[in-house]
């Protein structure tokens, strides 16, 4: 698969700038798609349910956005639970970076102070390297902390697999 450290530096710098919480999970893939096409897809909140694990429906609330879909916009994700997950855009740099934070209630006490960072970097040999990071504070209870870490492994890992299916990996 290769070393992606040159392609993940911007994601990690962004995460370090926007969060004082530890990195909990990271997944990185090279996909056979242009940077613009991939970024437009993952930042289109109305289509998030097509690739985010467990999402049944998704939409955008732009009522507090500086620009629709950008900083202040909220991705609303409806899954099996009665209360939707709300993810507010914290930073946006098209076609390269999207950073968002989810409401603490979404994690059922497993994690708080969440920050997600996604970057799309063009690869010199073609395609795009996507990096998806999750930062947060895990619960102090060891079992809940373990479950919180698993939650990110499943959510980010499964979401990345869905992106691989849509845009074949290299």
Regions found by a protein language model. Name each.
Residues 27-29, 85-91, 114-122:
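Hydrophobic/aromatic beta-strand elements that line small-molecule binding cavities or substrate pockets
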Residues 31-33, 81, 136-140:
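Beta-strand elements of well-folded, non-transmembrane domains
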Residues 19-21, 79-81, 108-112, 124-126:
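A generic structural micro-feature
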Residues 30, 50, 59-109, 161-170:
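Glycine-rich portal/gate segments that line the openings of hydrophobic small-molecule binding cavities
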Residues 3-8, 135-170:
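A conserved amphipathic terminal alpha-helix motif
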Residues 1-63:
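Hydrophobic ligand-binding cavity/cleft-lining segments
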Residues 37-42, 48, 75, 89, ...:
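Hydrophobic pocket/interface hotspot
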Residues 101-107, 133-140:
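Short, solvent-exposed aromatic-acidic interface loops
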């Amino acid at each position: 698969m290769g070393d992606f450290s040159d392609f993940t530096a911007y994601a990690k710098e962004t995460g370090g700038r926007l969060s004082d919480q530890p990195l909990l999970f990271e997944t990185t893939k090279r996909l056979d798609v242009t940077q613009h096409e991939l970024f437009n897809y993952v930042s289109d909140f109305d289509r998030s349910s097509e690739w985010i694990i467990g999402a049944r429906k998704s939409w955008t609330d732009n009522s507090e956005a500086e620009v629709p879909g950008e900083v202040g916009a909220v991705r609303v994700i409806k899954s099996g639970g009665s209360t939707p997950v709300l993810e507010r855009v914290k930073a946006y740099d098209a076609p390269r970076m999207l950073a968002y934070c989810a409401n603490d209630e979404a994690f059922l006490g497993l994690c708080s102070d969440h920050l997600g960072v996604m970057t799309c970097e063009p690869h010199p040999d073609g395609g795009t390297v996507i990096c998806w990071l999750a930062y947060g504070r895990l619960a102090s209870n060891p079992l809940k902390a373990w479950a919180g870490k698993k939650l990110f492994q499943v959510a980010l890992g499964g979401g990345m697999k869905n992106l691989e299916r849509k845009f074949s990996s290299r």
